[in-house]
Amino acid sequence: MDGVIDVNDMGDKGDIVILALNSGSSSFKFGLYRVRAPTAHASGIEPLLSDSIAMPTPQEAIAGIASRIAKFALAAPQAIGHRIVHGGPALRQHCVMDDAVLRQLEAAAPFAPLHTPAALAVMRAAQECFAGLPHVACFDTVFHADMPDVARVLPIPSQLQLEGIQRYGFHGLSCESIVQQLGDGLPTRLIIAHLGNGASITAIHRGQSIDTSMGLTPTGGVIMGTRSGDLDPGVLVYLMRENKLDGAMLEQLVNHQSGLLGISGVSSDMRRLHQAALSNANAGLAIQMFCASVAKQIAAMITVLDGVDLIVFTGGIGENDALVRTEVCRGLSWIGVSLDEHRNQAVGETIHNHLDVAINTTKSRCAVRVVASQEDGQIARHTWALMPQRHPGT
């Protein structure tokens, strides 16, 4: 594939300062890292600057990042890594950006309409601001690329599968960062619940993704902030036939008007829903349905794994919402999941310092931990790995 460099031929690149750009569906984060060879795939990443930034326009956001780097007199980046949610059927490996890759990304935009157009706009702005630097596309789908057919193949006619219609899976960089952090403590059977404005559940066996809740697009799976999650296809057929909704209207419905926002009629923000639930029954129902959806999907992944050794909560809600963790685990009490509520409630005071907090009781039949997602660090690692060979003195 154009732009792909053999990661086994990296040579002596030494230390590289890398800017990781992470544009999500509801946030824009960035991190500046010094990646040290030869430990880039272990612990050799030094964060120099990490933050989120308002993004009125991609150009202003990138200019703001460049300004902060200059303000703090930090080392200028030598390469830029970009989180790309979906590369479509053609892009299944992290790769160095070139014109051919850009064209393939543009063609794949319909697979992730909430994410890809915004990421492409950020990429173009970054290419203008940091002209001449290599830019690397890091895909959320790569982590799930080797899922077994029983998980990957969708129950549709085979000729449609040839068009690339299959389960891709997402939040791969987040899942990979959890596996990386667990290191030697990685269990055989791991379930990761990445809960944020977008949410997914992934079953991991010996470090490999074997099933995940999102499918062809990031709209499927559990209930999310504004996304419906799994929905009877008959609902969409009914709306097309009886309400005369076209494709654009259905896309708006399932991606922007559903989920927590659609159920509550109040907000897609879980923090606001907790407040509203004190007086608004629909807000309370939205929270209940979200937690039930997550617990149900975790239970399904337990079946896939033939048991579970560790459940990890991560993402904005997973790391910060003790009530959601309590309700989800209450729905899993039948398999012996038991939380230490004191530890669970104290997570907010410790997670961002310690990154990894155990919250299960000693009697729990599986471990439960809250682990901070470090997508940006993974972007930096992959960007380092794809840099051309740099010899001393060059």
Language-model regions: role of each:
Residues 284, 288-309, 318-393:
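Internal helix-turn-beta structural module
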Residues 252, 259-263, 270-304:
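Adenine-nucleotide phosphate-binding core of ATP-dependent small-molecule kinases
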Residues 205, 211-246, 252, 315-354, ...:
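Catalytic phosphate/nucleotide-handling subdomain of diverse soluble enzymes
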Residues 23-24, 82-87, 195-197, 308, ...:
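Glycine-rich beta-strand-to-loop/alpha-helix junction loops that act as flexible
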Residues 6-9, 18-59, 215:
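Short glycine-rich, Thr/Ser-proximal phosphate-binding strand/loop in the N-terminal lobe
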Residues 143-242:
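Glycine-rich phosphate-binding loop of actin/hexokinase-like ATP-binding domains
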Residues 16-21, 79-81, 136, 190-194:
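Short glycine-aspartate micro-motif
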Residues 69-119, 133-136, 142-154:
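Short beta-strand-loop/turn "lid" adjacent to the catalytic site in phosphate-handling enzymes
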